[in-house]
């Protein structure tokens, strides 16, 4: 990736667990982000983001598939091993995702874009852009 010389470790994509479902022995943590809408490189090529506090793979006690919030049947990413049982409302942080999240996103079926924010030195999130229905509507015209 030629651009990685300039855009390495650009920022995180923070998501939240909205539900946990189990089918055929696989637990899926449904997130409030979408792999197809917010992280398409994870589906289009073999890019595996680092997930804070987790390891890729099925070794360990707390194994989850991470699922996106779109209606696309393939909107999920692999199996991840966590050191604890995930809870609804818990934050899941994808490292080094902003460089593609902001330039390759789409609003498939009206899926919201994540807000663009920076953490201040005081630890407060300062929001620069919050996307709305009007942003979705305007992209359609």
Regions found by a protein language model. Give the residues of each.
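Charged (often Lys/Glu-rich) extended helix/loop segments that serve as interaction or gating elements
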Residues: 2-141
């Amino acid at each position: 990736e030629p651009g990685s010389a300039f855009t390495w470790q650009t920022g995180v994509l923070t998501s939240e667990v909205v539900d946990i479902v189990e089918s055929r022995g696989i637990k899926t943590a449904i997130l409030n982000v979408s792999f197809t809408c917010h992280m398409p490189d994870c589906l289009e090529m073999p890019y595996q983001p680092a997930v804070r506090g987790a390891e890729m793979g099925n070794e360990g006690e707390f194994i989850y598939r991470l699922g996106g919030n779109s209606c696309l049947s393939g909107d999920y990413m692999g199996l991840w091993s966590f050191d604890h049982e995930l809870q609804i409302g818990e934050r899941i942080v994808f490292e080094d995702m902003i460089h593609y999240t902001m330039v390759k996103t789409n609003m498939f079926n009206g899926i919201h874009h994540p807000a663009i924010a920076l953490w201040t030195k005081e630890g407060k999130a300062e929001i620069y852009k919050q996307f709305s229905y009007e942003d979705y509507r305007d992209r359609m015209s």
